[in-house]
Amino acid sequence: NDALVGSFDIPLVENEGDTLKIVFNSEKTIGFIEKAQVLFYENNYAIKQEYVDLANKLMDNTALMTIFRLSLTDSLRDMEADYMILPCPKYDEAQQNYCGFTHNGFSVFCIPVTCATPDIAAATLEALCAESYRTCTLAYYETTIKGKLARDTDTAEMLDLIHEGVRFDFGYVYSASLADLIQIPRNYINNGKTSKGASTLAKKVELSEKKLPVLLEAFENLQ
C-alpha cells in the first residue's frame, strides 16, 4: 500500500515559502483509500498477507503479481516460471508519468562525539558515499539486475522507466518522526472496508502536523 502512495503521485509534504507543510489530507489520498478498499474487500482476486508470504506465493505460481521492493529479484533468480518487472500503476489516465518514492529504510553513518576531527570524518564518509553511488550502485543496477536477473529486454526497459520516476518525499523519508505519516492509508485499508478514510484522515494527519515543527527545529539546531 505504501508503494501506491508514491506511484499515484500523492505528496505527503510540500514546500510552503521557507518552511514545509503536510498536504497528505487531500481528496486524492481519500480517493486512493477508497479505491484500495474496493480492491481488497469487494473482489476475490486480492490477497492480503505479509510481504514474505506474497513473495512466496508469486514464486510458487499461486499469485499472478505482487508489489515488492527491487530486492525481491534476488529471490526470483531460481524461479522456474518467467516473470516481468513493471512500474506500479498510475492513479488514473490523467497522470502523466510513472513515479514512485524511495523506501524510507536508509543506511546512515553516525560520528561519535569523541571524534577529534568530525569535519574530516564527515568529508571522508561523503566521498566514500559519492564513489559508491557512481560505481557500486551502477554495477548493481546495470550488471546484476539488468544483466543477470532480468529475463528479457522489456524488463530492462521497465527498470529504466521506474528509475526515471524515483523521487524523495520528506514526509516519507521522515515518516517515523511524523507519527508514521506514510502508514495512515495502510492502516485504514488493513482495518477493513468499514473504515472511513475521509472521517478520520484529518485527525491522523493533525498528529503528524504537530510533530513537523519539532522535527524541523531539530534540524535547525544541527546548524
Annotate each predicted stretch with a short phrase.
Residues 2-6, 10-50:
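Glycine-centered hinge/linker elements that transmit conformational signals in sensory
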Residues 28-31, 77-81, 88, 100-102, ...:
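Extended alpha-helical or coil "stalk/linker/tether" regions that are enriched in polar/charged
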Residues 33, 37, 55, 121-125, ...:
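Extracytoplasmic/secreted envelope proteins and their assembly/folding machinery
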Residues 51-66, 74:
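Short helices/loops that flank or line small-molecule/ion binding pockets
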Residues 64-69, 84:
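Paired acidic/hydrophobic, glycine-rich loop segments that form the ligand-binding mouth/hinge
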Residues 77-143, 147:
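Extracytoplasmic/periplasmic substrate-recognition and gating elements
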Residues 113-122, 130-223:
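Conserved C-terminal helix/tail region of periplasmic/extracytoplasmic solute-binding proteins
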